[in-house]
C-alpha cells in the first residue's frame, strides 16, 4: 500500500491551491490529490476574487504570469442602485465604483479552465493528481496513518497518509464520515441562483460619452458588477472567452422564495430594466442554484491530522467575493499545521491548532456580520455608500494587510489579535444595528430611494491611505488610527443624517474624541446621542482654547445642538461684555470648524 505525506480530497481550486502551496513550500513532500470527476468541465460559481486571494495566487502559488495570460484582471467591485420601480437605465443609476484599475490586483476566474490548467501545472511539479478517483471510505487514525479508499476505473485502491485534507466542497467527505456537526446558519437566510451566458455585450458596450468619461473610460465590464436592491442583488461577472456569469442572491426572510428554474430565473432578471438591457441577445450555457447558502462545521483543523478547506468547512455569502479568501486563509493555516507536525514540533502544533481554529471561526463570524440583517439596506445608495466605506477600510486594515504581512501564522500576533475578537464583533454588531435602523427610518420617511439616481462615488478614494502601506511590514499604530477613524467618521455620518445635525462627521474635535470603544458605547442612537457627542467635543474644545488663552478666565466652552448648523457655541466664564469675549468666541468657532480626517469628507 502506497503512503503519502498528504492526501487531498478534491481538485477544485481549494484542493489544487493547497497541494500547490504545500509542494512549493516543501518540494520533498509526497502529495496525492483525489478527484471524483474524470473531467474538469463544470462552470463553478466563485469566479470573482479580491485582494487577499489574488496576493495568495501571485505570491504563494507563483501564478502571476498564468493569471494575466489566461484569466481576466478584475477592475474592483462596482455597485449600481435603481429606483423603486426598477426601471432606471443603467446610465442613470447611482454608482459606486472606480475610475481606474485598483492598486492591488484581483482577477475574474473561469473556474473550469483554471482547474484543468492547475492540474497539469501541479503534476509538472511532482503532485500526484488522480481523476475519476471516487473516495469510498476513510479510516482516520490519530495515532498512526490514515487510510483512504477510492475507486478508479472499476478498481478499488487503498493509500495511507499522515494528513488528510478535505477539499471536496459541499460533499464534506471527512466531516460526514466522522459524524461531525454541520450547522445550517440561521442568522443569514440567503439563497442564490445563477447561470452562464455567451454573447452578453457587457457594460462597456453602453454608448453614453458622459457616462463612459465619468470613469475615465476604465472598463466597467471587468468589475464584479452588483445591481443592488432591497433584499437582494444581481451580479454580472465577466469570464475569459466571452462568457458572463449572471446571478442573484436574496434574503428569504426579506422577500421569500424566488424562482428556482432557469426560465423563472431569466424572467426575474429581465424584470429589471438595466439587467434586461444587458441581457439582450444572450445565449444560455447553464443554470445552477442553492436553496440555502450559509453553514459551518464545529472544527476546521484537528489534532488527529485532518483539516478542511473551502466549502468543506464553511460557506457564507458571495457578496464581496470572499469565497477564495476563505480558501486562502484555510490553506495558509493548514500548511502551517502540516509543516509544524512534519517538523516534529508537538507542543507548537497543539497551540497552533487552538489558535488556527479560533482565528478561522473569527473570520467566519466577522464576515457573517457584513451581511446578517443588512440585506434590507442594500437597495439604498445613501446608506450603502457609508457601509461600503467602513467595510472596505476594515477589509484592507483587518484582513488584507495581515495576510500580506504573513501574520496569519505568526503565533504571537494571533494571540494578540484574538484577545480583541469579542470586541471587534460587538463593534460590527453595533454598526449593523445602526445601518438597519437608518434603513427603516428612511423607509418611513419615504426617502429610501432618494439618492438612487444620478449619484457617483469613487470607492477607491476611501482606501487610498492604505494602498502603498499594504505589504510585508504591519504598522500597528497606523492600523489603530485608521480603525478609529473609520468607525468614528461613519458612525457620526449616520448619526448626523438620522438626527438632522449636519457637519458632525467632518469635525476634528468630534472625531478625535470618538474612538472605536466610544462608538460601541454610543451604539443605541437616540435624541440624546448628539448631546453626548457634543459634550465630549466641548471638553476637547475647552482644553484647546484654554491652552491658547490661559489668562482669559475661561471656564468652559459649551456646544448645543442646532439642526441648521449641527451645533452652536457658548463661552462660559467670560462675560459677553468683556472685550476678549468676541475674540474667544471667534477662535472657538475656528477650532470647532477645523476639519478632521473623516472618511465621509473624502471626495468619492
Can you annotate each of these PLM segments?
Residues 519-604:
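N-terminal targeting leaders
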Residues 41-87:
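N-terminal FAD cofactor-binding segment of flavoenzymes
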Residues 338-518:
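C-terminal helical "tail/cap" subdomain of flavin- and related membrane-associated enzymes
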Residues 121-274, 331:
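Predominantly flavin-linked oxidoreductase catalytic cores and closely associated redox partners
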Residues 230-232, 253-372:
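FAD/FMN-dependent oxidoreductases across multiple families
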Residues 23-45:
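Glycine-rich FAD pyrophosphate-binding loop
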Residues 1-14, 32:
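Beta1/beta-strand and adjacent pyrophosphate-binding region of the FAD-binding site
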Amino acid at each position: 500500500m502506497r503512503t503519502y505525506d498528504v492526501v487531498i480530497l478534491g481538485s477544485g481550486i481549494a484542493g489544487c491551491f493547497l497541494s500547490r502551496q504545500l509542494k512549493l513550500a516543501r518540494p520533498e513532500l509526497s502529495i496525492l490529490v483525489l478527484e471524483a470527476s474524470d473531467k474538469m468541465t463544470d462552470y463553478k460559481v466563485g469566479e470573482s476574487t479580491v485582494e487577499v486571494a489574488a496576493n495568495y495566487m501571485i505570491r504563494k502559488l507563483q501564478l502571476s504570469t498564468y493569471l494575466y495570460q489566461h484569466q481576466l484582471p478584475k477592475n474592483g467591485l462596482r455597485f449600481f442602485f435603481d429606483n423603486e420601480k426598477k426601471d432606471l437605465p443603467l446610465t442613470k443609476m447611482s454608482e459606486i465604483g472606480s475610475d481606474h484599475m485598483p492598486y492591488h490586483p484581483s482577477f475574474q476566474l473561469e473556474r473550469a479552465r483554471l482547474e484543468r490548467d492547475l492540474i497539469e501545472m501541479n503534476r509538472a511539479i511532482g503532485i500526484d493528481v488522480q481523476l475519476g478517483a471516487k473516495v469510498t471510505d476513510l479510516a482516520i487514525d490519530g495515532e498512526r496513518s490514515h487510510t483512504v479508499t477510492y475507486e478508479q476505473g472499476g478498481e478499488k485502491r487503498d493509500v495511507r497518509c499522515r494528513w488528510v485534507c478535505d477539499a471536496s466542497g459541499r460533499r464534506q467527505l471527512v466531516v460526514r464520515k466522522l459524524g461531525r456537526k454541520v450547522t445550517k446558519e440561521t442568522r443569514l437566510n440567503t439563497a442564490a441562483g445563477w447561470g452562464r451566458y455567451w454573447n452578453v455585450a457587457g457594460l462597456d458596450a453602453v454608448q453614453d460619452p458622459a457616462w463612459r468619461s465619468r470613469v475615465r473610460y476604465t472598463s466597467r465590464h471587468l468589475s464584479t458588477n452588483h445591481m443592488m436592491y432591497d433584499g437582494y442583488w444581481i451580479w454580472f461577472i465577466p469570464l475569459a472567452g466571452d462568457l458572463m456569469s449572471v446571478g442573484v442572491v436574496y434574503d428569504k426572510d426579506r422577500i421569500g422564495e424566488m424562482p428556482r428554474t432557469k426560465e423563472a430565473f431569466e424572467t426575474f432578471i429581465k424584470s429589471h430594466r438595466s439587467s434586461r438591457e444587458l441581457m439582450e441577445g444572450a445565449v444560455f450555457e447553464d443554470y445552477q442554484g442553492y436553496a440555502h447558502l450559509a453553514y459551518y462545521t464545529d472544527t476546521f483543523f484537528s489534532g488527529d491530522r485532518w483539516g478542511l478547506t473551502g466549502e468543506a468547512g464553511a460557506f457564507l455569502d458571495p457578496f464581496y467575493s470572499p469565497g477564495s479568501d476563505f480558501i486562502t486563509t484555510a490553506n495558509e493555516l493548514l500548511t502551517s499545521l502540516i509543516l509544524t507536525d512534519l517538523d516534529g514540533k508537538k507542543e507548537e502544533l497543539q497551540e497552533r491548532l487552538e489558535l488556527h481554529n479560533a482565528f478561522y471561526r473569527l473570520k467566519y463570524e466577522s464576515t457573517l456580520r457584513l451581511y446578517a440583517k443588512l440585506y434590507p439596506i442594500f437597495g439604498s445608495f445613501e446608506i450603502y455608500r457609508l457601509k461600503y466605506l467602513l467595510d472596505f477600510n476594515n477589509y484592507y486594515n483587518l484582513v488584507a494587510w495581515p495576510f500580506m504581512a504573513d501574520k496569519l501564522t505568526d503565533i504571537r500576533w494571533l494571540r494578540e489579535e484574538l484577545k480583541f475578537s469579542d470586541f471587534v464583533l460587538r463593534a460590527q454588531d453595533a454598526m449593523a444595528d445602526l445601518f438597519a435602523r437608518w434603513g427603516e427610518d428612511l423607509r418611513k420617511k419615504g426617502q429610501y430611494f432618494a439618492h438612487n439616481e444620478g449619484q457617483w462615488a469613487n470607492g477607491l478614494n476611501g482606501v487610498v491611505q492604505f494602498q502603498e502601506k499594504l505589504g510585508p511590514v504591519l504598522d500597528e499604530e497606523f492600523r489603530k488610527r485608521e480603525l478609529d477613524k473609520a468607525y468614528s467618521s461613519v458612525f457620526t455620518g449616520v448619526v448626523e443624517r438620522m438626527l438632522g445635525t449636519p457637519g458632525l462627521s467632518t469635525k476634528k474635535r468630534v472625531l478625535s474624541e470618538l474612538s472605536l470603544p466610544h462608538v460601541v458605547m454610543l451604539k443605541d442612537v437616540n435624541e440624546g446621542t448628539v448631546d453626548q457627542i457634543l459634550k465630549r467635543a466641548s471638553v476637547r474644545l475647552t482644553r484647546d482654547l484654554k491652552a491658547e488663552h490661559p489668562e482669559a478666565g475661561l471656564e468652559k466652552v459649551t456646544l448645543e445642538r442646532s439642526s441648521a448648523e449641527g451645533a452652536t457655541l457658548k463661552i462660559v466664564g467670560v462675560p459677553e461684555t468683556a472685550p476678549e469675549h468676541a475674540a474667544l468666541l471667534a477662535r472657538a468657532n475656528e477650532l470647532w470648524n477645523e476639519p478632521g480626517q473623516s472618511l465621509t469628507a473624502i471626495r468619492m
